[in-house]
Amino acid sequence: MSMQDPIADMLTRIRNGQAAHKVSVSMPSSKLKVAIANLLKEEGYIADIKVSGDVKPELEIELKYFQGKPVVELIQRVSRPGLRIYKKRGDLPKIMNGLGIAVVSTSKGVMTDRAARKAGMGGEIICYVA
């Protein structure tokens, strides 16, 4: 059976891994998943990422905790295959009054809502992270 929404699966694996206090989670890799994981690493929500394997690449995400609690409080899919959500630069949401991020897919690549606003771009809202 094929996977309908690989990005939602990735976010769910991160959410479940942190709820179970796992050190890391692994999943099948794709360019978009790696771009989202790199963005989460830059923003400090995950500790590290590794891509291994040539034929079927695996993405391994090392989860991050602070004083025993998961760093990621909220990770929620917004745009999905059945209902794509696009926003213009002025309509990009602020998550938790700027404490969280919205991951946006633009024509210049995957970036945060702050970076998209600064670049004057809108795009598809992939997920919210706080």
Swiss-Prot record:
Q: Name one GO molecular function term.
A: rRNA binding
One of its Pfam families is Ribosomal_S8
> Which InterPro entries does this chain map to?
Ribosomal_uS8, Ribosomal_uS8_CS, Ribosomal_uS8_sf
One GO CC term of this entry? ribosome
Q: Which UniProt keywords apply?
A: Ribonucleoprotein, Ribosomal protein, RNA-binding, rRNA-binding
Could you give a single Gene Ontology term from the biological process aspect?
translation
User: Which branch of life, at top level?
Assistant: Bacteria
Q: Which HAMAP family match?
A: Ribosomal_uS8_B
Q: What is the protein's quaternary organization? A: Part of the 30S ribosomal subunit. Contacts proteins S5 and S12.
Q: What does this protein do?
A: One of the primary rRNA binding proteins, it binds directly to 16S rRNA central domain where it helps coordinate assembly of the platform of the 30S subunit.
PANTHER family documented for this protein: 40S RIBOSOMAL PROTEIN S15A
Record family assignment: Belongs to the universal ribosomal protein uS8 family.
> This protein is called what?
Small ribosomal subunit protein uS8
Q: Which organism is it from?
A: Tolumonas auensis (strain DSM 9187 / NBRC 110442 / TA 4)
The organism's taxonomic lineage, starting at the top: Bacteria, Pseudomonadati, Pseudomonadota, Gammaproteobacteria, Aeromonadales
**Which gene specifies this protein's sequence?**
rpsH
